[in-house]
Amino acid sequence: MSSSRQAEIKRKTNETDISIFINIDGNGISEIDTGIPFLDHMLHQISSHGLFDLKIRAIGDTHIDDHHTNEDVGIALGKAFTKALGERKGINRFGHFFAPLDEALVQVTLDCSGRPHLSYGLKLKAPRIGNYDTELVREFFIAFVNSSGITLHINQIEGRNSHHIVEACFKAFSRSMRMATEIDLRRSGTIPSSKGMLEID
C-alpha cells in the first residue's frame, strides 16, 4: 500500500476553527477533541474500526449549540478523505458492512464515486444521547457526503436504544470506508471507473 495517502486540512470560519490529519493506511490511532464528547466517541469509532489514523481538533461556538461544529467537522473530514485519496487510483471503491451492537443492527453501503448522495434510515426515538442532539447524526453524514463525494446508504435493521443504533451506524460506516478505500492489487493502480475518473460532479 502507498504510504502517501495522508492529508491535512485546516478550515476556519466565523463559527469554527478545525484542523484534521488523516492517514488512510494507518493503525487506528486517534487524537480527537471537538468539544462535543459524543461526537468524539463516534469519531474514535471511525478511526479504530476503519484503521485510519486521525487527529482532529475543533473549536466552535458550542456555547450556542453543537450544530456548527458537528457539521463543519463532517465537512472537514470529508475533505481530508478526498485529499488523501487523490485520484482514487486502485481503490476498491465500494464498501459495505453490517454492524451489530446488542439489539441494534445497522447496514451501511457506500460508493466512493464522486456522486454525493445520502439515504438515511436511522429511526432514533431519543431526542438526545447525553447532551448530543440526535438530529445531528444525519447532519454530520450530509456534510461528509457532500464534501467527500460519496454515495452513502444507511439502513437500520433492528434497534431500540438510540446510543446503540448510532454507534452501530458509525462502526458499520468505518468498516465500509475501510473496505472502499483499501487498494485492490488486481487493479494495478488504475481508477475503478469505466469513464476513467472519479471526481465530485
UniProtKB/Swiss-Prot annotation:
Keyword RNA-binding among UniProt keywords: no
Keywords: Amino-acid biosynthesis, Cytoplasm, Histidine biosynthesis, Lyase
GO cellular component terms, A-Z: cytoplasm
Catalytic reactions on record: D-erythro-1-(imidazol-4-yl)glycerol 3-phosphate = 3-(imidazol-4-yl)-2-oxopropyl phosphate + H2O
Single GO molecular function: imidazoleglycerol-phosphate dehydratase activity
Transmembrane feature ranges: none
Pathway the protein takes part in: Amino-acid biosynthesis; L-histidine biosynthesis; L-histidine from 5-phospho-alpha-D-ribose 1-diphosphate: step 6/9
Main location group: cytoplasm
EC number: 4.2.1.19
NCBIfam families associated with the record: PRK00951.1-3, PRK00951.1-5, PRK00951.2-1, PRK00951.2-4
Protein name: Imidazoleglycerol-phosphate dehydratase
Source organism (scientific name): Prochlorococcus marinus (strain MIT 9515)
